[in-house]
Amino acid sequence: MLTLNKTDLIPASFILNGVPGLEDTQLWISFPFCSMYVVAMVGNCGLLYLIHYEDALHKPMYYFLAMLSFTDLVMCSSTIPKALCIFWFHLKDIGFDECLVQMFFTHTFTGMESGVLMLMALDRYVAICYPLRYSTILTNPVIAKVGTATFLRGVLLIIPFTFLTKLLPYCRGNILPHTYCDHMSVAKLSCGNVKVNAIYGLMVALLIWGFDILCITNSYTMILRAVVSLSSADARQKAFNTCTAHICAIVFSYTPAFFSFFSHRFGEHIIPPSCHIIVANIYLLLPPTMNPIVYGVKTKQIRDCVIRILSGSKDTKSYSM
């Protein structure tokens, strides 16, 4: 009788097929993807440079924005370059271990994106509800600790994805109808029981996004109460304006995330696979692309710094708000 070792059921590599059903148009799809990726790289690197270089931006709000920019850079860079290689050069192979690494980085930093947005909501809550204590509550050590905790939360919750995926037997081929290695997309190629993978994936989603959304909702509920109680219309308008960019970032992040998550689990037979794959990529591209634009347009301090640098002002380091 022929017996198979466990290693015989683990493929050496997967073949990423890109966007299923749209193979003939993938070259055209690559242009908006590439454009968004370039904007994301330039915008987020520019924000990181500004926050590091400008003394005026050495404040808690901008430290959290730097965390968001770094997270966005890693999040989109973990998938989009490979997707462009698939679209342009038909380089579809990805090693099994390389696939697990991509899976780890993608899911870890999407979780961290949500965590940083939650921290930014808490930052706005402290700034509006406790303005006199803002700098004493959100000190540099506190910011470093909560940022590290958010990163470790993602790492510790996502590491089991790689082990659960590696333990599965794969006897349904190695062709993956996707542009990157998503946890459940890879697990569905297995001929084993993926119930544990599905349940754990749902638990992680609830622990990360459920907790973060609850904190964001509570923060903005208290912000709304504080703002409404202000006697001056100008003060209310100014307080709301400080939250506009963050609210836009939340919308850009959570809208495609929820669509991708629920369509993958509950709308598989309703929503075309091509639509799901495109949204899954937009989910990783839209926040990194739009966040620098929104914060650049809505935040006066960042606009002023950019204008002074572009105008060649030599007094950028000494400028204070």
From Swiss-Prot:
Residues 49-56, 123-141, 220-239, 298-321 are cytoplasmic. One of its GO terms (cellular component) is plasma membrane. The chain crosses the membrane at residues 28-48, 57-77, 102-122, 142-162, 199-219, 240-260, 277-297. GO terms for molecular function: G protein-coupled receptor activity; olfactory receptor activity. It comes from the Eukaryota. It is a multi-pass membrane protein. Pfam families: 7tm_4. Disulfide bonds join 99-191. Residues 1-27, 78-101, 163-198, 261-276 are extracellular. Keywords: Cell membrane, Disulfide bond, G-protein coupled receptor, Glycoprotein, Membrane, Olfaction, Receptor, Sensory transduction, Transducer, Transmembrane, Transmembrane helix. It is found in: Cell membrane. Glycans are attached at residue 5. Belongs to the G-protein coupled receptor 1 family. Odorant receptor. PANTHER family: OLFACTORY RECEPTOR 52N4 (PTHR26450:SF194), OLFACTORY RECEPTOR 56B1-RELATED (PTHR26450). This is Olfactory receptor 52N4. The gene is OR52N4.
